[in-house]
């Protein structure tokens, strides 16, 4: 990728008229701005313009859709100018970001070699709504299993409080409150019971490891203090109620888990949120095959459910979908903000 220096202090990148790729950080800046985070968008745009000052980082992210580690450096507090920029959410972006990228090029490149971890607790509102819809079909506890669980914070979803368009659910005394902007029909409010919870991740984060928790916090956008506080509280709950997350590959773990004995009167429920986008075509095929084979074995006493919170194939929307076996019918319950900030509920319960 040809990296070019640009103008200073938040000036836009030149209009390419679609002829030149503006660069991975500029593309991400556009996406982040559209998702409501102008400060992080400005940081990324400045990073694109100043990328020539960090050759190791530039080489690493060429054609690679991951974010840079500026948030982690700001949180660490070692770079006073960067920390000040993040604290004030304004300033000379190009000067500060450029100097930081030049000074911390090796650190940023090394930090980016590990997979991103965004255990977004805000998505649990959509998952909880889907679980309550499922409970209206099968009045039984669920055996909750999560693919790509990260630190396993979503496995504690029954320990959080929810406000779904004025309809409350979950634990009202919880320090974690998830209240997305709700549009559409009211959700079906049902008490859910989690018989057991377990997840899998290629590199699960240990909630008792301060460095791992700090890394997770660094993925929260700097201008979203509410998200950061919610994550901090979810980590506190997780330390009191440690989630069980296996280290493993989804495509190998899922078939084994689905083949395990299932108690009668328990709905085996598989959840995945923004996890399948990291699989290649063969990985997707393996997941679909595992669900199809397990679905063929499901019955009314031992049902199987799949809750997906994923981008569409065109990556133009995030859909919340529920598939229930033995009938195998998939319902598009809602369209959602990628981090759960709003939910447009479509399901009528029919």
Annotated model-derived regions:
Residues 1-106, 110-117, 121-127:
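A short N-terminal interaction module
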Residues 79, 91-92, 98, 102, ...:
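Class I S-adenosyl-L-methionine-dependent methyltransferase module
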Residues 126-134, 291:
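Short alpha-helical segments and helix-capping/turn motifs at coil-helix boundaries
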Residues 144-147, 271-272, 305-311:
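Extended hydrophobic secondary-structure segments that form protein cores and membrane-embedded regions
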Residues 152-156, 278-280, 315-317:
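Short catalytic/ligand-binding loop motif for oxyanion handling, primarily in non-cytosolic enzymes
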Residues 219-221, 225-229, 243, 285-287, ...:
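Domain-level detector for long C-terminal conserved domains
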Residues 249-262, 290-295:
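A short, acidic, amphipathic alpha-helical segment used as a generic capping/interface helix at domain edges
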């Amino acid at each position: 990728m040809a990296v070019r220096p640009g103008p200073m202090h938040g000036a836009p990148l030149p209009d390419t008229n679609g002829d030149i790729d503006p660069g991975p950080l500029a593309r991400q800046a556009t996406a982040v701005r559209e998702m409501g985070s102008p400060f992080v968008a400005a940081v990324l745009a400045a990073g694109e313009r100043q990328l020539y000052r960090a050759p190791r980082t530039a080489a690493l992210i060429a054609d690679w859709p991951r974010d840079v580690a500026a948030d982690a450096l700001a949180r660490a507090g070692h770079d006073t100018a960067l920390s000040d920029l993040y604290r004030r959410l304004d300033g000379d972006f190009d000067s500060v970001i450029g100097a930081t990228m030049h000074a911390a090029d090796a650190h940023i490149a090394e930090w980016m070699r590990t997979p991103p971890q965004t255990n977004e607790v805000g998505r649990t509102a959509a998952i909880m709504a889907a679980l309550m819809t499922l409970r209206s079909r099968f009045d039984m506890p669920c055996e909750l299993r999560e693919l790509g669980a990260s630190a396993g914070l979503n496995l504690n979803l029954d320990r959080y409080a929810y406000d779904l368009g004025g309809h409350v659910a979950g634990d009202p005394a919880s320090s974690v409150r998830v209240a997305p902007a709700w549009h559409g029909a009211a959700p079906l409010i049902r008490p859910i019971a989690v018989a057991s919870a377990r997840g899998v991740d290629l590199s699960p984060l240990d909630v008792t490891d301060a460095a791992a928790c700090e890394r997770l916090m660094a993925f929260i956008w700097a201008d979203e203090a509410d998200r950061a506080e919610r994550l901090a509280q979810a980590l506190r709950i997780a330390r009191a109620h440690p989630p069980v997350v296996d280290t493993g590959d989804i495509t190998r773990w899922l078939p084994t888990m689905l083949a395990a004995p299932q108690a009668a009167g328990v709905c085996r429920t598989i959840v995945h949120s923004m996890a399948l986008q990291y699989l290649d075509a063969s990985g997707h095929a393996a997941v679909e095959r595992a669900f199809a084979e397990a679905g063929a074995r499901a019955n009314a006493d031992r049902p199987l459910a799949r809750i997906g919170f994923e981008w569409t194939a065109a990556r133009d929307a995030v859909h919340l979908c529920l598939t229930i076996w033995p009938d195998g019918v998939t319902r598009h319950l809602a369209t959602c903000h990628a981090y759960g900030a709003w939910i447009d509920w479509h399901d009528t319960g029919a």
